[in-house]
Amino acid sequence: MPLRLTLTGLASQYIHMPLAPFCLKRAVDGSLPDVTTTICDLNINDTQEDLLHRVMATEPDVLGISLYIWNRECAARLIRRVKALKPEMIVIVGGPEATFSVEETFREMPVDYLLRGAGEESLPALLRLIMGGGDASAVPGACFRTADGLHISLPAPAPAPRSDLYDETWHSALNGRMAYVETSRGCPFQCAFCLSGHHHKVALDTLGDCKQSLSLVGQEPDLRHSNKEAPDARTVQFMPVDEALALLIRIGNSGCDTVKLIDRTFNCSKVRTMVLVRGLINAKQQGEIGDVCYHFEVAADLFDDETLDLLATAPAGLFQMEAGLQSFHAATLDACDRHTDMAKLVDRIRRILRPNNIHLHIDLIAGLPEEDFVTFGQSFDNAFSLHPHQLQLGFLKFIHGSKLRMEKWGARFAPDPPYEVLSTPWITYTELRRLHDAAEAVERIHNSGRFALAENLALEYTGMRPFSLYLLLGEKMAARQGRWSLDNLTRLVYDVFLCLGVPEHALRDAMITDRLATDNTGYLPPFLQHEDASAVKKAARAYREAHPGCGYPRVAVLSDGSAVVATWTKKHPVTQRGEVAAFCGK
């Protein structure tokens, strides 16, 4: 009999478009012509009433929801409402939050089936049984209630990603949003706080063609990060590299600004990395790719000289990278099964940053084992000294299935998603709260790029450690309730830096230049404006006379009477700062 299936991933924000529903739709459409599949584009910021209305509008017989730490609670409420309204509707859940918490999921949600592991094969098999009858225990990964309790299966294996997923349905749904793309599954490493490397098998034969093309036969994924006990057990499923390159080029022309690869370690194979990087650089240079940025998660210490030399030739802004340091503390890295040559990693990060053509993020995680407040501060200072474009401070999540959640090491964490650390034997709840405040300050002040000159000036004049400075800024921000406008934040930074002894004239000039470089309106808050408004008007008039047709220039007068202008004709593709130049304003 015909069946109507509705799939949703319940994204955390509208800009994020989960891949799982599209993977599953493709799998179902290809094998079950009697099933009509609809993807319901929902996110957790919608009201429960709206979520229910939009699901019911698709008139499903079966509802499938992917569970993650960001949507589990919202999904549970939605499922309870769906079942209250239409008890006969069959609800199937999957995803990591289902795979690794089977009993909890059945206890908390009135679901009919739970699929562990990859669903591309198991979902069509289960739907076939729902339509025609049969024993669901034969379906890989299928879990369900029985008269005796629960039938729990082992997770279904994951197939390699497929490029045909990204069809017209996917492109239409994209609609200018960030494009998430998967060209590999799994990870060759087994970090104790993560799931990606723990449940996959290797399929390296897909690299055959690119090995020959580069004369680099025999270079497999590098396992230097990983637990040395059993490296052969940790592997990756790759999309064929030529197929992956063609896909990335095609999506680069889809109209999106950013193509974000969700591959856990993009550069785990040097051969594959070289093929994809060189191919994208060539495509950009030949005009086959528009104004788009490709975002990769990398293990920076795996880059060798040849790969770094190639990356240095990339057009500015083509690539963005996220390097997960997590910590500089050796005991912490060891406790997390991360065996990293830190000196090499630091060198590689500096070499990536040197040409200023790649936007680089560095990640730190607070709450890891063996890491106290002092050693985290040292990690912060070490990471900050590398001058990444963004320094991201995260907090340990005790996700289901991770080694750190399963081990008994005295940590306390929130019982509800995202299961964030509350305290450990090494760091207190109060200290973690201070780090949360500092993280907010880092995100709004450092990572925004809006205060780069002022920040450098404050560190230079005060001699403060970056960690101490951002603890202070976080404390001041936390003491002030309410929303932060740009002007309010600028005032807070100005006041804090002034109290620390930064000379007023130098600080004002730095903040004026920062503002003009990052805000194309040219507006300055009153406390940064020159006291003589006529001097600013005179400077603007002088610039217009020297540059006919320039429109209304964004001009400011500095403390010494000199003038600067932001033309915004040149915005750096990596820093996104506009050009601010001095000129004679007399």
Residue map of PLM features:
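Residue-level signal for short, function-critical loop segments
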Residues: 11-13, 69, 265, 300
